[in-house]
Amino acid sequence: MSSDFPHYNFRMPNIGFQNLPLNIYIVVFGTAVFVFILSLLFCCYLIRLRHQAHKEFYAYKQVILKEKVKELNLHELCAVCLEDFKPRDELGICPCKHAFHRKCLVKWLEVRKVCPLCNMPVLQLAQLHSKQDRGPPQEPLPGAENIV
């Protein structure tokens, strides 16, 4: 049977990395660029999500109460912890103008994204409020020092 099929001795040429055709380099380089661009897009997406979460978390105005002022209409106590406002307290003021201790408001907004007093959505109000802020500049609240 071996006489029916002649035996040929073929050897594959030894192709090194230097002898590869240019098309292979283009494919490898193109794949690397594609993976790099995908990773950049993914990083930008993650940064955008983090930025959006940061905006949602701080959708209220932070101020420090300098002194007790009647013009602020603060109701003199925090509706979340039921403690009186004191000078130098850090306050969080919702876009609906209700004020709370900043720490109380942060804990409240972690659970619910609404104002503790009027149940208005804080994020929707903040978005509407930011659109209205593009108009004439508003003066700071009397008796409060803006920290944001």
Curated annotation (Swiss-Prot):
CDD domains: RING-H2_RNF24. It holds the Pfam family zf-RING_2. InterPro entries: HRD1_E3_ubiq-ligases, RNF24_RING-H2, Znf_RING, Znf_RING-CH, Znf_RING/FYVE/PHD. It is found in: Golgi apparatus membrane. One of its GO terms (molecular function) is zinc ion binding. Its main location: Golgi. The keyword Transmembrane helix applies. PROSITE patterns: ZF_RING_2. SUPFAM superfamilies: RING/U-box (SSF57850). Keywords: Golgi apparatus, Membrane, Metal-binding, Transmembrane, Transmembrane helix, Zinc, Zinc-finger. It is a single-pass membrane protein. May play a role in TRPCs intracellular trafficking. Interacts with TRPC1, TRPC3, TRPC4, TRPC5, TRPC6 and TRPC7. This is RING finger protein 24.
